[in-house]
């Protein structure tokens, strides 16, 4: 089951959170945000590497400028969004959920 919250989504990797869902959220982010830099980071979950690659590649295809920060704590992306000229950020994390889970958390200048 995909869990939706105010800041993003979480789910079982390759079941609830697969390539189709990741691409769908990349397009939603693109449609919502104005032009500008999007920061992307992830936690150390093994699945994060593939998810971040899909997300970044899709956003680049849509013409977005991406600053990839690698493995960082969630507050790092939030800080970068709110202290730079960025218009948004994405952190790939499932916080306290089991390792089989991952998620897409958004940090937007409008929130």
Go through each PLM region and give its residues.
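An N-terminal, well-structured beta->alpha segment
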Residues: 1-65
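Conserved small/polar residues in nucleotide/adenosyl-binding loops
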Residues: 2, 109-111
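Generic structural "secondary-structure junction" signal
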Residues: 8-15, 73-74, 106-109
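Histidine (H) residue identity feature
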Residues: 27-30, 82, 110
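Ferredoxin-reductase
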Residues: 36-107
């Amino acid at each position: 089951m995909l869990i939706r919250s105010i800041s993003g989504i979480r789910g079982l990797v390759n079941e609830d959170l697969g390539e189709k869902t990741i691409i769908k959220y990349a397009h939603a982010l693109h449609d919502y945000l104005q032009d500008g830099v999007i920061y992307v980071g992830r936690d150390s979950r093994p699945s994060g590497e593939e998810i971040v690659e899909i997300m970044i590649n899709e956003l680049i295809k849509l013409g977005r400028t991406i600053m990839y920060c690698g493995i960082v704590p969630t507050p790092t992306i939030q800080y970068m969004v709110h202290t730079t000229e960025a218009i948004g950020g994405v952190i790939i994390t499932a916080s306290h959920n089991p390792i089989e889970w991952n998620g897409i958390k958004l940090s937007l200048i409008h929130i």
